[in-house]
């Protein structure tokens, strides 16, 4: 739709500008807050292989979470674009990071992890709704890849200001099971309350 082309494009630009304005102290605090929210759920108790990302363009910083996962023996898988799909590589404290063609950082030569091995994935985004609609950067890499593994638990990671009341659903990205921001953890209506990994730990 026309709105899809122009409305979503304008929304992406607006939200990206907001997150690019944050300073390193903001990023540090927000990254820690996101980790604190996720640490209250069963996710880190149950997951063995977790998809994550290395922050770029003002995205929410997952460093505190990733470091905690390493200590707990959880394998971290980081995406890399290959032939318009995402492939995932094991990311360890010893990984050498290289800048890929899109300007993203990815582990250079670490072991490839099949998407089917991931139990959950933390997905960056430019805008989201509380129903779990996600607007990405527009290239569709996550959409194409995640549609191949419908059972994979998808958790959007965003700044609270990236929440909107709606995004155009004719062209929006894959739906999310939950969204975590620096302010809260929201289970969306996609598969909602039925996922044990997303419940608060007792």
Predicted regions and their residues:
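Intrinsically disordered, low-complexity segments enriched in small/polar residues
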Residues: 1-4, 51, 139-140, 198
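N-terminal active-site beta-alpha-beta segment that forms phosphate/nucleotide-binding
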Residues: 3-117
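Conserved phosphate- and dinucleotide-binding cores of soluble alpha/beta proteins
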Residues: 86-202
């Amino acid at each position: 739709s026309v709105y899809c082309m122009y409305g979503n494009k304008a929304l992406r630009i607006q939200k990206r500008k907001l997150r690019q304005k944050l300073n390193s102290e903001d990023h540090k605090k927000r990254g820690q807050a996101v980790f604190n929210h996720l640490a209250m759920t069963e996710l880190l108790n149950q997951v063995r292989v977790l998809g994550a990302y290395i922050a770029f363009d003002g995205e929410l910083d997952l460093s505190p979470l990733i470091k905690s996962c390493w200590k707990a023996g959880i394998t971290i898988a980081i995406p890399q674009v290959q032939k318009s799909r995402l492939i995932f590589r094991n990311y360890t404290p010893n990984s050498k990071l290289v800048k890929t063609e899109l300007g993203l950082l990815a582990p250079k030569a670490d072991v490839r992890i099949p998407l089917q091995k991931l139990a959950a994935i933390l997905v960056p985004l430019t805008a989201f709704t509380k129903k779990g609609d996600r607007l990405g950067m527009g290239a569709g890499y996550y959409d194409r890849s995640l549609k191949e593994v419908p059972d994979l638990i998808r958790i959007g990671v965003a700044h609270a200001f990236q929440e909107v009341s709606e995004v155009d659903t004719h062209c929006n990205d894959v739906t999310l099971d939950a969204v975590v921001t620096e302010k809260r953890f929201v289970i969306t209506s996609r598969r909602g309350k039925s996922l044990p990994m997303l419940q608060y730990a007792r």
